[in-house]
From Swiss-Prot:
Basic residues biased stretches: 1-16
Protein name (record): Large ribosomal subunit protein bL35
GO terms for cellular component: cytosolic large ribosomal subunit
Family from the record: Belongs to the bacterial ribosomal protein bL35 family.
Biological process, per Gene Ontology: translation
Upper classification of the organism: Bacteria, Pseudomonadati, Pseudomonadota, Betaproteobacteria, Burkholderiales
GO MF annotation terms: structural constituent of ribosome
InterPro entries from the UniProt entry: Ribosomal_bL35, Ribosomal_bL35-like, Ribosomal_bL35_CS, Ribosomal_bL35_sf
HAMAP family cross-referenced by the UniProt entry: Ribosomal_bL35 (MF_00514)
Record key words, sorted: Ribonucleoprotein, Ribosomal protein
The encoding gene: rpmI
Source organism per UniProt: Bordetella pertussis (strain Tohama I / ATCC BAA-589 / NCTC 13251)
Positions of region (Disordered): 1-25
Length: 65
């Protein structure tokens, strides 16, 4: 059986919290920001949790996290 490996692209995008939930960054805040309102950009700051329907696939990409 081959070695289990972490998908490095997933490891750079997700972090596992102490409670076991997975943290992700917000999308839509890299470019084309002039047409977005200040409120919209402010609400995109910070992090969010991965939805429960996607948690299993994210954990499969990071077997050692």
């Amino acid at each position: 059986m081959p070695k289990m490996k972490t998908k490095k692209s997933a490891a750079k995008r997700f972090k596992v919290r102490g409670s076991g939930s997975i943290k992700r960054g917000q999308a839509f805040k890299r470019h084309i920001l002039t047409k977005k309102t200040t409120k919209n950009k402010r609400q995109l700051r910070g992090s969010a949790a991965v939805h429960e329907t996607n948690v299993a696939s994210v954990k499969a990409m990071m077997p050692f996290a």
